[in-house]
């Protein structure tokens, strides 16, 4: 199964969004909430690269860092990426557990929509573009646009070879309540 669009599709999305900012790209801003805790450099860089490499500029990355003193490299790496991308917001916080740390990331958000991502995730290059377009389509049809979700894949060594694919069904509130 193909998990990512063809290269030419991604290039077309990038061309459509070239030179545009989060304000003028026409897509709603999505704040990606991510609590950080002692994140290994490899995973942190892969995650940050996946945000910086999005095909659309409609994202804001909100990072709440509860790493301990032995992992000061987390802050250093994030600050390095902030130099490249003004849409990365960072705050050092006291560790209060994943739920409270995620809420701390939410306090940094200014987007119309919130998305959740773990510190060892990799965002598909078209994730924010696709979500933004889906929101616009729902609005155009006059349908509620308050909740979106996506499929996911789990990887071990290479993002080219998924270990597990989790294809989620169409929206079904009863199913959602049973699983969460």
PLM segments and residue spans:
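Short, acidic, metal-binding catalytic loop of nucleotide-sugar glycosyltransferases
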Residues: 49-58
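N-proximal low-complexity "stem/linker" segments adjacent to membrane-targeting elements
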Residues: 1-50
């Amino acid at each position: 199964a193909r998990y990512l669009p063809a290269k030419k599709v991604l290039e077309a999305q990038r061309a459509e969004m070239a030179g545009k900012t989060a304000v003028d790209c026409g897509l709603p801003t999505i704040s990606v909430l991510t609590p950080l805790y002692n994140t290994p450099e490899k995973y942190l860089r892969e995650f940050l690269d996946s945000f910086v490499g999005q095909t659309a500029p409609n994202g804001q990355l909100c990072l709440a860092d509860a790493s301990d003193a032995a992992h000061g490299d987390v802050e250093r790496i994030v600050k390095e990426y902030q130099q490249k991308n003004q849409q990365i917001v960072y705050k050092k916080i006291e560790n209060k557990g994943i739920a409270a740390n995620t809420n701390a990331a939410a306090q940094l958000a200014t987007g119309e929509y919130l998305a959740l991502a773990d510190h060892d995730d990799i965002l598909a290059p078209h994730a924010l573009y696709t979500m933004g377009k889906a929101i616009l389509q729902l609005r155009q049809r006059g349908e509620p646009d308050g909740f979106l979700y996506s499929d996911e894949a789990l990887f071990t060594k290479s993002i080219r070879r998924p270990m597990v694919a989790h294809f989620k069904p169409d929206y079904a509130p009863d199913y959602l309540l049973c699983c969460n």
